[in-house]
């Protein structure tokens, strides 16, 4: 009797085996969370390969259509502009490092947001380098300048420069418009 009750309790603890109800619409990689395309907030890919972006207006069912774009990064930048305009500093951005460089819409009107989003998507933004990735002055870079010939004239060395300055008369002003 004890064996049957322990057997029943084990059966209840197991999760039920899901029934297969046909083919899954997702590939194995998508089911595992692995995707070939980048995944940005507010961006999705159409079946024919174009990327679209839209954002939901707060406290409304409607969405603001931001456009169709050729790359997911363009669509993500458009979404970031709209998110900043609608949600302000609490917005979740795809590229937070570009937040201060993105165009701002003239107003919160959907038309203005769409125009600013299109402008942000059209520009090829390069992410600003982080402080850790900036190149500091190194001895190798300094050596490149030390190998150059001394092109600047030493004004204290009058022996070398006497003939050079004699070609410019003191009484005639030097005007660039004569050349």
From Swiss-Prot:
Purpose: Probably acts as a transcriptional activator. Binds to the GCC-box pathogenesis-related promoter element. May be involved in the regulation of gene expression by stress factors and by components of stress signal transduction pathways.
Main location: nucleus
GO molecular function: DNA-binding transcription factor activity; transcription cis-regulatory region binding
Family: Belongs to the AP2/ERF transcription factor family. ERF subfamily.
SMART domains in the cross-refs: AP2
Compartments reported by the entry: Nucleus
Biological process per Gene Ontology, one example term: ethylene-activated signaling pathway
This protein's record includes keyword DNA-binding: yes
Keywords in alphabetical order: Activator, DNA-binding, Ethylene signaling pathway, Nucleus, Transcription, Transcription regulation
Residue ranges of DNA binding: 39-96
Domain of life of the source: Eukaryota
Keyword match Magnesium: no
Gene Ontology CC entries for this record: nucleus
Pfam families attached to this UniProt entry: AP2
Region of interest (Disordered), ranges: 1-42
InterPro entries: AP2/ERF_dom, AP2/ERF_dom_sf, AP2/ERF_TF_ERF_subfamily, DNA-bd_dom_sf
Biased composition (Basic and acidic residues): 1-11
Protein name from the UniProt record: Ethylene-responsive transcription factor ERF039
